[in-house]
């Protein structure tokens, strides 16, 4: 029998509806492990695993098809892009309550020669912390982080476990706080109510509804590009210049990567000023909406 998009329907032991006929690989319908919905996941790793499992089943051993989360990677010129689990769009389409964080980091300690940028995105449940998926892009180190997050999903770890994960560390290989740890910290800040974020695709609507963008980068950073119509107050001057901000206005705060804007968000909230953090900050916005920036 066939099912989704003509894929072969099999049971949990890879048996078709015909006696003694089994099917595995790209042609079979599997369960998307997170949503438990039917899926066609055409990847070599699950297909090879299925071959081993069906051989065990035919030999009389108990092996079950547990489905797949769909972990994939591709090289595009000098960049690597990888994903695991559900995208933000897929999670929302499945009806899951969804939150998202982006972080910018380096593949290893930034002060050690040869460090390159990478961007990571985490999709998760905002209260339980269940991890739905992750994506990453960068020159180096993306495979390592997505493999870790794929393992976390398979092992049913949550965002609250990510800061506690331990990795081998020396400056040529990583950072004392790995980008995966930082993803966990950022996600926990949302889950615990310490931060509220605005996604890049929500910014224009927020500004149209009266919010003001506050850029806390320093002048040297702003020489590499600026948000249009943003209020500029460097973070190290913000506490002394809080009186310049209107307590009746909602502020969306950005820096280069999101860390300083989180600090600024906390400062504003403690001063009784409404504030949210632009998730991914300038670094992400420059990647997805460069036409809306000045002097890029």
Outline where the language-model segments fall.
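Rhodanese-like catalytic fold shared by cysteine-dependent sulfurtransferases
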Residues: 160-171, 175-212, 219-252, 256-296
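FAD-site-proximal beta/loop scaffold in flavoenzymes
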Residues: 1-53, 152
